[in-house]
């Protein structure tokens, strides 16, 4: 912030030189953590006493199998789940880019949709869910499952990619 103010002051002629000109701060790039297949299985098998944690776990697993972003999952409607040749698919557009996408629904995501259909409001598949609540509860899910990694909801999308690559290489 201060560097920006000084740069603007120098550009506008308010100071003769920019004392920060030689300093460059490189971004702190952190390697993203991911879950192993065994950790995903452990999360799926864990029995939660708290129904909120069970919901958060199931939505995270849904994302692992569909690669939907949080906002795309949050806005997923029953109209976007269609049957094609006897199989269920999600046909929608990305919220962020408006680019169409399609995802075949495997058994586990279908079971999750069925489990939470009572939450459906205004055709939303999972009702109203809050991102920050989800993130906070996801930390509790990981802790209760004995996973000591800093996992975000976005991590589920990366699991889907590695899972897809693994399946396609078999």
Segments from the language model and where they lie:
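Alpha-helix C-caps/helix-loop-beta hinges
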Residues: 5-8, 12, 79
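Non-catalytic DNA-binding core/recognition domains of DNA-processing enzymes
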Residues: 1-8, 23, 105
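Basic, Lys/Arg- and aromatic-enriched nucleic-acid-binding interface segment
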Residues: 11-70
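C-terminal catalytic core of tyrosine-transesterase DNA break-rejoin enzymes
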Residues: 61, 65-72, 137-140, 157-170
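Short basic/aromatic active-site micro-motif
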Residues: 55-56, 128-132, 148-168
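Active-site/catalytic core of tyrosine-dependent DNA strand-transfer enzymes
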Residues: 106-148
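Conserved tyrosine-mediated DNA breakage-rejoining catalytic core shared by Y-recombinases
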Residues: 22-39, 66, 75-114
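Alpha-helix N-cap/helix-start motif at helix boundaries, enriched for small hydrophobics
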Residues: 2, 59, 71-76
């Amino acid at each position: 912030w201060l560097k920006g103010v000084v740069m603007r002051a120098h550009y506008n002629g308010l100071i003769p030189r920019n004392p920060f000109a030689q300093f460059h701060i490189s971004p702190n790039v952190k390697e993203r953590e991911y879950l192993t297949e065994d950790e995903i299985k452990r999360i799926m098998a864990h029995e939660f006493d708290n129904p909120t944690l069970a919901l958060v776990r199931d939505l995270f697993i849904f994302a692992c199998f569909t690669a939907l972003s949080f906002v795309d999952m949050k806005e997923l409607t029953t109209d976007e789940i269609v049957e094609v040749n006897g199989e269920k698919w999600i046909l929608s557009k990305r919220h962020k880019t408006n680019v169409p996408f399609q995802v075949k629904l495997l058994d586990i995501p279908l079971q999750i949709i069925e489990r939470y259909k009572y939450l459906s409001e205004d055709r939303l598949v999972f009702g109203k869910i809050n991102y920050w609540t989800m993130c906070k509860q996801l930390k509790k899910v990981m802790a209760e499952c004995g996973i000591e990694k800093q996992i975000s909801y976005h991590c589920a999308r990366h699991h889907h990619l590695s899972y897809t690559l693994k399946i396609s290489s078999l």
